């Protein structure tokens, strides 16, 4: 495996330039030899002055936890907003099973990276719906959904959950050099209003980033209670991909 630090500085600068309130990182390196033992999630968090919520993407009993480099791959959510609660869930199917849940004062954020296998993805979407159904606040769900058969895979999940894609024009993000697939998504509850979305054509990783601006209204007062911005980017290496989501 080759080191992945070549674009890391540029990725950090890109994230800082967006000045996001919430950041999600998928398959970020927590300190393997290929990044010279430093924790990428903590490094980005320090640059943004954010808190970090992170965990290995593999379940405790997974063989991947015993494999060098893979055992340092995980997901993370960073935020400069007050955190009410943080929770880690693991799907029952697939190799990549982690779901990170971060509850903020006005919204709950989920970060996922779904399986490459169709059957496993469908089971994971069912589990994800069950998690969302138990929420009592507006929800944002973001990450790499790996829908290799297209967004038809997501229709039942979206219909059941009531979530909407922030990417209303279905702009492609993969591969970044010549995008022709929509694998990365940001979904949100109807209480959240999109005010802007774009896919910048930068090639710091194998996936192009997603940028999203949104607001949340308080139905009790008809007033704005939270204005925010979101990004999804992937600082991937050549062999073991990394994903960065800035939400």
What feature does the model see in each segment?
Residues 1-47, 54-57, 62, 217-247:
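N-terminal, active-site-proximal structural segment of metallo-dependent hydrolase catalytic domains
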Residues 3-4, 27-106, 198-201:
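Structured beta-strand-rich core segments of catalytic domains in phosphoester-bond hydrolases
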Residues 26, 112, 142-144:
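Active-site flanking residues adjacent to catalytic metal/cofactor-binding acidic residues
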Residues 30, 114-116, 147:
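Short, glycine/acidic-enriched loop or turn micro-motifs at the edges of active sites
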Residues 83, 88, 103, 120, ...:
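Metal-dependent phosphoester-hydrolase catalytic domains
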């Amino acid at each position: 495996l080759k080191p992945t630090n070549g674009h890391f500085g540029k990725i950090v600068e890109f994230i800082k330039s967006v000045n996001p309130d919430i950041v999600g990182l998928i398959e970020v390196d927590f300190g393997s030899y290929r990044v010279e033992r430093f924790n990428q999630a903590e490094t980005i968090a320090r640059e943004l002055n954010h808190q970090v919520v992170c965990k290995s993407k593999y379940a405790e009993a997974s063989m991947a936890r015993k494999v060098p480099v893979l055992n340092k791959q995980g997901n993370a959510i960073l935020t400069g907003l007050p955190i009410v609660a943080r929770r880690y869930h693991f799907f029952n199917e697939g190799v990549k099973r982690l779901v990170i849940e971060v509850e903020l004062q006005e919204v709950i954020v989920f970060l996922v990276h779904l399986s490459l296998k169709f059957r496993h993805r469908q089971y994971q979407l069912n589990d994800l719906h069950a998690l969302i159904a138990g929420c009592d606040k507006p929800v944002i769900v973001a990450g790499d959904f790996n829908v290799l058969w297209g967004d038809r895979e997501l229709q039942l999940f979206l219909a059941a959950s009531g979530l909407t894609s922030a990417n209303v024009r279905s702009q492609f993000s993969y591969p970044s050099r010549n995008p022709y697939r929509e694998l990365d998504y940001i979904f949100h509850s109807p209480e959240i209003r999109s005010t802007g979305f774009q896919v910048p054509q930068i090639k710091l990783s194998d996936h192009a980033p997603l940028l999203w601006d949104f607001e949340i209204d308080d139905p009790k007062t008809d007033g704005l209670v939270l204005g925010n911005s979101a990004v999804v980017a992937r600082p991937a290496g050549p062999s073991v991909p990394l994903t960065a989501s800035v939400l």
